[in-house]
Amino acid sequence: MLPEIGAAELLIIAAVALIVVGPKDLPLLMRRIGQFMAKVRSMASEFRASFDDMARQSELDDLRKEVEAMRRGQFADMSIADGAMTEAAGDIEKSLAGVGVQLHSPTGYENTVEPPPPEPEPQPAAEPAPKPARKPRAAKPKAAAAPKAAAKPKAAAKPKPKPKTPGLKARKTAGSAE
């Protein structure tokens, strides 16, 4: 609200309004004051928005002028630089023409010199032969597996267990009871 009006001042204003207007018309008066304040605030915000738009527009105009000035300055600098480049190229050509050297443009350059033949690479004196790659175990033939088995003799052959039969167990238990 207003920074100059405190709580005490608001109470005094409310008491005077109650006495002057009366309790019957006070709610209607408060509603009209609220509507008036809303209109004032909306008008102030519209004014502020239009003022901000004008400020932005003037800033944009200034920026546009600066950009145009920079563009003109750059193109002017480019034409000056282009003139200086052509002048320098002309000076170089004149000085080389006095010596008897001809300049060729890079696009018209042809290589007339043949490159020297490549020198043969020296071979190393002794290079170990590379080991052959191992084959996977699944890919080995079965014939190769037999000599390995013969090369490694088994220490002792275990006897095969006898097959168990149900009748045999019953006989042993019956025989031990006798």
From Swiss-Prot:
Composition bias, Low complexity: 141-154
Major localization listed first in the record, in broad terms: membrane
UniProt keyword Transmembrane helix, yes or no: yes
Source superkingdom: Bacteria
Compositionally biased region (Pro residues): 114-131
Coiled coil regions in record: none
GO biological process, one term: protein transport by the Tat complex
Transmembrane segments annotated in the record for this chain: 2-22
Any one cellular-component term (Gene Ontology): TAT protein transport complex
Compartments, as annotated in UniProt: Cell inner membrane
Region named Disordered: 104-178
One Pfam family per UniProt: TatA_B_E
UniProt topology in membrane: Single-pass membrane protein
Task of the protein: Part of the twin-arginine translocation (Tat) system that transports large folded proteins containing a characteristic twin-arginine motif in their signal peptide across membranes. Together with TatC, TatB is part of a receptor directly interacting with Tat signal peptides. TatB may form an oligomeric binding site that transiently accommodates folded Tat precursor proteins before their translocation.
Protein name: Sec-independent protein translocase protein TatB
Organism the protein comes from: Phenylobacterium zucineum (strain HLK1)
